Amino acid sequence: MANKLIGEMGLHTKISNIFAARNIITAKDALSMTEFELMELLDVGMKEIRSAISFISEATSPPCQSARSLLEKKVENEHLSGHLPTHLKGLDDTLCGGIPFGVLTELVGPPGIGKSQFCMKLALSASFPVAYGGLDGRVIYIDVESKFSSRRVIEMGLESFPEVFHLKGMAQEMAGRILVLRPTSLANFTESIQELKNSILQNQVKLLVIDSMTALLSGENKPGAQRQPQLGWHISFLKSLAEFSRIPIVVTNQVRSQNRDETSQYSFQAKVKDEFKDNTKTYDSHLVAALGINWAHAVTIRLVLEAKSGQRIIKVAKSPMSPPLAFPFHITSAGISLLSDNGTELKGPGINTIHARGHSDMINFHGDCS
């Protein structure tokens, strides 16, 4: 709805032409500005501005629907509401089948914990034949930090799915379905994802991976406050792209040190603010996701990868379909493997805090375990 063209709404021709002349093309362009900003830019009176905004808002607002009609619509379109299997049984069961289509899924954790390994395994799964639990499609893998390894992907395939990868030519075919892009700047990345919207459906793309979004923004050498408007546009575009294309979009996020003022950024953490003050030694060692609270609200699924006392753990920290659960895992030649399919339910501040204790001795597996 936000991308609906103003020129196609039936707005009065005169005011519609003024919007077009000032390069305000979509409903989002108009509704992202204040009335005073529009009045100054378009050089028309407040009465006309308010009338136009009211018309555009009404034209783009979806009609009211009952819970019953939404359920019926979901049932009718169940084939569009699938999941990409992670081939980690406990995690797939928790997520009702795997990484869901049509939404943003975030992997957040310290360097070397296994985020890129997880992404490469997902890319492999998406390219696999349906008969073997895959999506039989292509993958676009935006490799910002040059961590993608074709050799590692093939190794994972040979170890995890030998019955498929030992077939003649299958390894080359699977690797050939993964298109790797390496943007050199945020501007280059922005241009690339804008071009993807039409090609995704035409080329049977079944997964988009961005590894990592944090690295793209940190390369701009701008303070965090100045990066937020840029991040806001990318959040909106990626959510729209996921919904439009009905594919899973997986984005990795790095971590930074948590300061004491951030302990109440989540509602449940506000309740333990006093506890935090009395226990700073424990909480000062925690990390938080680098992209901040606005990004955290934008993602539908958040998987936190952390290390406690030398043990890797993957947590389902945010999901509309399950309680917060934690699974211990390790990384082998086959990729990430759960040590137990029975997750431990989490409560309180442990859901979103990120540990990296005893982690430094685990980051050199195959030379790349990010």
Curated annotation (Swiss-Prot):
Example GO BP: DNA repair
Major subcellular site: nucleus
Name of the gene: RAD51B
UniProt-recorded Gene Ontology molecular function terms: ATP binding; ATP hydrolysis activity; ATP-dependent DNA damage sensor activity; DNA binding; DNA strand exchange activity
Family that this chain belongs to: Belongs to the RecA family. RAD51 subfamily.
GO cellular component, one term: Rad51B-Rad51C-Rad51D-XRCC2 complex
Keyword Nucleus in record: yes
Keyword DNA repair set for record: yes
Protein name: DNA repair protein RAD51 homolog 2
Pfam families associated with the record: Rad51
Annotated tissue distribution: Preferentially expressed in flower buds and roots.
Key words of the record: ATP-binding, DNA damage, DNA recombination, DNA repair, DNA-binding, Nucleotide-binding, Nucleus
Induction pattern: Induced by ionizing irradiation and treatment with a cross-linking reagent, cisplatin.
Cellular compartments annotated: Nucleus
Binding site for ATP: G109, P110, P111, G112, I113, G114, K115, S116
Domain of life: Eukaryota
Alphabetical list of InterPro entries matching this protein: AAA+_ATPase (IPR003593), DNA_recomb/repair_Rad51_C (IPR013632), DNA_recomb/repair_RecA-like (IPR016467), P-loop_NTPase (IPR027417), RAD51B (IPR030548), RecA_ATP-bd (IPR020588)
Function: May be involved in the homologous recombination repair (HRR) pathway of double-stranded DNA breaks arising during DNA replication or induced by DNA-damaging agents.
Cross-referenced PROSITE patterns: RECA_2
Organism: Arabidopsis thaliana
